[in-house]
């Protein structure tokens, strides 16, 4: 397991996006966090710390803000051999109701899961003190709950996805994870309907999805910046107001968006002045891209002729 260095991020940056009432609520939560965290360490454990991981982005931000608040918070990433990484993605897909790579969850997969997580637990368990809080993120980490619970930690398992319509795949994934989650003190879901049948409601909490407002991908773009990016990419027809659009990367390094030649298009650029239905996400079955296209096609007659 690898410790991820995190630079504290001023809470004032977050407060600048909030109303006065929301800022007061934030201050109250931070004060409560300081009291509850006194004498304790909070460990966040994620499968990945990659920049393209939404979970990693959220954990990095929360950890940075907590450090600024004076709360002892640490972030660790699993050591995952390639077969375990495949299994992790399979579990994630199945919890969402998708068959993913078409693989299975049998004794061989369980042996791999337990072996890898046992090795990871050994790397960290000696640092756990009685009363510490360990937050395990996603299916790949659920198997760590027993080791950290037996070490005296309060264990929280955080599930960042799911499906409201249980099917064969999601039921099998929950059956796979259930014996490990019996060791968790609490479970946190993004929606109450994602809670599995075996999880007692009074042991679960719901935290809605959120974004990092100061992240480069979430910052507000003015109209000229927006038009420049989509025209430089060839998505919209017309001349870009700017030849390049500068931005600051997550790690503070400067970057620039110039002409983009590798963008995949179907049917050519959108004509000037046309209205557009847009989804911005990575291309993944879990993001609903295909469903958006299907919904657009099914209801095309309800939209104006110039809508793309």
Please tell me what each predicted stretch does.
Residues 1-308:
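Catalytic cores of nucleotide-sugar-dependent glycosyltransferases that transfer UDP/GDP/TDP-activated
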